[in-house]
Amino acid sequence: MLSRNVYSRLSSVLFKTRYFSIACDHIGLNKLGINKPEVIHHNLSYPELLRHEQKNKEGTLMKCKYGDTFSIDTGKFTGRSPKDKWIVKQVDSESDSNIWWGNVNKPINPEIFEDLYTKAITHFNSLDECYVFDGFCGASSQSQKKVRFVHELAWQQHFVSNMFIRPKNKSELYNFRPDFTIINACSVVNQDWEKQGLNSEVAIAFNLEKKVAVILGTWYGGENKKGIFSLMNYWLPLEGTMSMHCSANVGQ
């Protein structure tokens, strides 16, 4: 049964520049501990993503009135899992004093995060290929952030390509240094959650000091988007800007 929660319009404005598949060290994945995948598909165009989605049998191409749509099944999660969202509480850090800790912003210690991070990295080091999207959140140059997503599924790259601002050309990717990276190991189930004192086998965990987050155990694409939006809601007020719950990836 096809899930109703992700319908990525292929009739969107196409990003026609082709970016070639590259190695881990070329874009700095090795600094995250990801060394194994021999092929990194970097900022693929929509037609290229569709070819990968179909080759990987990740969903179904549907003919719709307003253009072709690729429909996928996200499993048991058709929405976010807010009770599984965690933030590293680093004593005496900047984030420790700025975050409103409670039932929404729930703390975990750095050791638990490192365990979750290791599970994600170990998974990607077992793959032959993966997908990387580099882009921007926020249209204003004054508040715009560089974001990177590392995925095992082409459709999740498709999703973030729709949600975030794509680079206009290769020059914007030259020496790209993300302000934050999300590593989405959606197929990895955290079987140690009870021992760690977490809510379930799903984990969406952020380390603001290390500028990285990991997603485990949920295929729901919205966790990618909401993760960065949550970070913007943290960063922007500290920069003197009121944050709003809205976005656009195409002007006009």
Predicted region positions:
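N-terminal mitochondrial targeting presequence
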Residues: 1-25
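A noncatalytic interaction/capping subdomain that flanks phosphate/NTP-handling catalytic cores
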Residues: 21-251
